């Protein structure tokens, strides 16, 4: 759903498992209960926690390699999720990163790039902040630091991205 006005729409009994809502209005009053699976945030709304991000780096031969980044989302960070398992935040601490091919931990001197914006670099030990993070939780693919709660989801996502856009 892109640029949709959903204010008068009845989505009862609709399976929205794979749907994305991009720049839609009218979702602010969505009913959240046991029947609206995935409407509840996928990440904790309080406290700090660990998240995982798929990213990439160059190997010594300048080939693009998928990387799994471990992030700490601090207690004061904005965080959200829409209707899928993908989450977003405005601040994260980069704890570590390793290559998916051999599990090698990367040193903090290796630039790790966002798949969406190659100029957005993750450096181990640094705190990143996105000042213009979109706080509309239903705008899933908007500005912010994207991550998953489960390592397996981040791994699958970056492998899919590499296969679709690089190989």
Name these PLM-found stretches.
Residues 117-140:
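Short aromatic-glycine-(Arg/Gly/Cys) micro-motifs in beta-strand/loop hairpins
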Residues 1-7, 154, 160-165:
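Extended, small-residue-rich solenoid/repeat segments and analogous flexible loops
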Residues 39-112, 120, 136, 145-146:
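Conserved mixed alpha/beta catalytic, RNA-binding, or beta-rich assembly cores of soluble enzyme
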Residues 6, 21, 26, 89-91, ...:
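Residue-level detector of bioactive/disordered segments in secreted/extracellular proteins
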Residues 1-63, 79:
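Tandem repeat scaffolds
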Residues 11, 136, 162-167:
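Intrinsically disordered, low-complexity regulatory segments
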């Amino acid at each position: 759903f892109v640029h949709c006005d959903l204010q008068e729409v009845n989505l009862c009994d609709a399976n929205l498992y794979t749907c994305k809502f991009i720049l839609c209005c009218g979702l602010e009053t969505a009913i959240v209960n046991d029947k609206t699976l995935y409407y509840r945030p996928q990440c904790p709304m309080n406290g700090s926690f660990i998240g995982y991000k798929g990213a990439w780096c160059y190997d010594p031969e300048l080939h693009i390699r998928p990387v799994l980044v471990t992030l700490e989302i601090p207690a004061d960070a904005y965080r959200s999720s829409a209707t899928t398992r993908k989450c977003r935040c405005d601040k994260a601490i980069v704890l570590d990163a390793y290559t998916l091919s051999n599990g090698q931990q990367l040193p903090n001197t290796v630039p790790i790039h966002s798949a969406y914006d190659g100029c957005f670099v993750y450096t181990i030990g640094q705190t990143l902040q996105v000042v213009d993070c979109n706080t509309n939780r239903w705008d899933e693919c908007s500005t912010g630091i994207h991550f998953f709660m489960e390592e397996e989801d981040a791994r699958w996502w970056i492998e899919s991205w590499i296969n679709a856009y690089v190989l």
